[in-house]
Amino acid sequence: MISSLWIAKTGLDAQQTNMDVIANNLANVSTNGFKRQRAVFEDLLYQTIRQPGAQSSEQTTLPSGLQIGTGVRPVATERLHSQGNLSQTNNSKDVAIKGQGFFQVMLPDGSSAYTRDGSFQVDQNGQLVTAGGFQVQPAITIPANALSITIGRDGVVSVTQQGQAAPVQVGQLNLTTFMNDTGLESIGENLYTETQSSGAPNESTPGLNGAGLLYQGYVETSNVNVAEELVNMIQVQRAYEINSKAVSTTDQMLQKLTQL
């Protein structure tokens, strides 16, 4: 009888985790390049009273056995790297990725991180950086006298300078792809880092080796579907209520037992 309380409790914990994931998705509905998550669950160990296939007599075996479950637990929060919409900004330093790949940036400790947020800016040294100040890799320096910046679909960065008719190439924006995008670790600030599960980074020119293309003057918006998340929220709410009902029903049954 008591076990049902703990089983229902695992259900409540699982739905709370599910709700946390949905809330985070909705909170980041306006975050550039954000990829929504979904909670993945698995059942816990079973109490086996009769083994499936065990002998019930000399001539017969149990077709299904008797196993009592002990609940559920969250096993993963899978990040879904589907394409977000491209929103036009008309800012020459904004770049959106259409397809696979990430921009590579350098962290303060010299290690690499990866992002889909292409709302770039220029720092005091003319270096192309993210909105958080992380330098884009390979480093790209925009001259102080640049009149305009052009970023091609293939990542070639060129500028027009005063007194020069022809544009001058100042750098190359490459894209990094991974065998398993879901295996990347989210570290906040729209950044991911490589893990053993993601596989090694593969740097490519946009449009080659499976990498996407770049669109200047656009940013990729979040791939969160608000309507879908609200439907998921209703389902979670109902599941939470059902598990709460299981707790209260078990409590009522225990009260009846104590009255005997």
Curated annotation (Swiss-Prot):
Query: What Gene Ontology terms for biological process does this UniProt record contain?
Result: bacterial-type flagellum-dependent cell motility; bacterial-type flagellum-dependent swarming motility; chemotaxis
**Main location as per UniProt:** other
Q: Which UniProt keywords apply?
A: Bacterial flagellum
- GO cellular component terms listed in the entry, alphabetical order: bacterial-type flagellum; bacterial-type flagellum basal body, distal rod; bacterial-type flagellum basal body, rod; cell outer membrane
Transmembrane spans: none
- What SUPFAM superfamilies does the database record attribute to this sequence? Flagellar hook protein flgE (SSF117143)
The domain of life is Bacteria
- Pfam families for the chain: Flg_bb_rod, Flg_bbr_C, LlgE_F_G_D1
Where's it found, cell-wise? Bacterial flagellum basal body
Q: Which family does it belong to?
A: Belongs to the flagella basal body rod proteins family.
Subunit structure, per the record?
The basal body constitutes a major portion of the flagellar organelle and consists of four rings (L,P,S, and M) mounted on a central rod. The rod consists of about 26 subunits of FlgG in the distal portion, and FlgB, FlgC and FlgF are thought to build up the proximal portion of the rod with about 6 subunits each.
Q: What is this protein called?
A: Flagellar basal-body rod protein FlgG
